[in-house]
Amino acid sequence: MSTNEMNQKKRLNRSGSLSSHLTRSWPWQLTLSYLFFMLILPVIALLSRASDELFKDFWQIAAEPVAISTYVVTLMTALFATLINGFFGVIIAWVLVRYNFPGKRIIDAAIDLPFALPTSVAGLTLATVYSDQGWIGHLFESIGIKVAFTRVGVAVAMIFVSFPFVVRTLQPVLVEIDQELEEAAWSLGASTWRTFWRVIFPPLTPAIVTGVALAFSRAIGEYGSVVIVASNIPFKDLTAPVLIFQRLEQYDYTGATIIGTVILSISLFLLFGINFIQSLNQLYVK
C-alpha cells in the first residue's frame, strides 16, 4: 500500500471517529442543556438572588420567629406524614404485588390519584371530608380531635399528596424479588417475620429510602392543598411554602427568596445525604 493510500485511510478513520463521536455526544449535550435550563439554572438564580442579601438581611429574615415557626411546622408535619406513608406504603405495595383480589386494578390505579388531581382540588376535598361536619371529621370531633384547620390537617394533606411515591418506588423492586428465596427460607424453618427481615427487607431498603425521601421532599414543598386545609395562622399551622406565598402577596420578594432558599437548602442537604447513604449501602452489598 502506498503512502498516499495510507494517509487517505487515516483521514477516513479520523473522519469516521469524529462523526461517531458527534453522533454519540449530541444526546449527552441535549440532556445537559435540558437539565441546566430546567433544573440547575433556576436554583442558581435563587441562590444568587439570596446571596445579594447575605450580608444585609439574610440571617435576620431567615431567623425571624415566624419563619422559624414555619420551618418547625413544615418539617415536623412532613416527617410525620413520611413515617405514615413509609409504613403503609410498604404494606400496600406488598399486597398489590403479591396478592390477587377483586378490584385490584382499580385500587392500583387509585394510587396515582394524587398525581392527577390538582392540589387545590385535593385541599378542598380534604377540608370538606375532615371538617367538623365532614364524613370523617365529625368522628374525630366526637372524641375531641380537630383535623381540618390544624397541624393534623396539614399532615393529612401531606400524606395524601406524597403517598404514591413510596408505593410506586417499591412495586418494581418487589416484582423482581425471587419468591423461591422465601420458600427456601421457610423450608429451612424460618418464620414469616424472620424471612421478611432477613430475605425480603435488605433488597427493599434502597427502594424504601428512595421512596421515603421523595415523599418527604414532596411534603415539604406542598402548598396547594395545605393552604386550603390549614388555618394558616402564624405559630399554629402556617407552613413555609404558604409563608413564601404570603410574602410574595405583600411584594416582599427579598423575604420570600430568603425563606425559599432555606427550604431549598434543607431539601438539597437531605437529597445529598440520602444519596450518600445509598452509595455506602451499594459498597457494602458489593
Curated annotation (Swiss-Prot):
SUPFAM superfamilies named among the record's database cross-references: MetI-like (SSF161098)
Subcellular location: Plastid, Chloroplast membrane
Topological category with respect to the lipid bilayer: Multi-pass membrane protein
A single MF term (Gene Ontology): ABC-type sulfate transporter activity
Keywords: Chloroplast, Membrane, Plastid, Sulfate transport, Transmembrane, Transmembrane helix, Transport
Any single GO CC term annotated in Swiss-Prot or TrEMBL for this entry: plasma membrane
Family: Belongs to the binding-protein-dependent transport system permease family. CysTW subfamily.
General function of this protein: Part of the ABC transporter complex cysAWTP (TC 3.A.1.6.1) involved in sulfate/thiosulfate import. Probably responsible for the translocation of the substrate across the membrane.
Alphabetized NCBIfam families for the sequence: 3a0106s02, permease_CysT
Name assigned to this protein: Probable sulfate transport system permease protein cysT
Species of origin: Chlorokybus atmophyticus (Soil alga)
Lineage: Eukaryota, Viridiplantae, Streptophyta, Chlorokybophyceae, Chlorokybales
Primary gene name: cysT
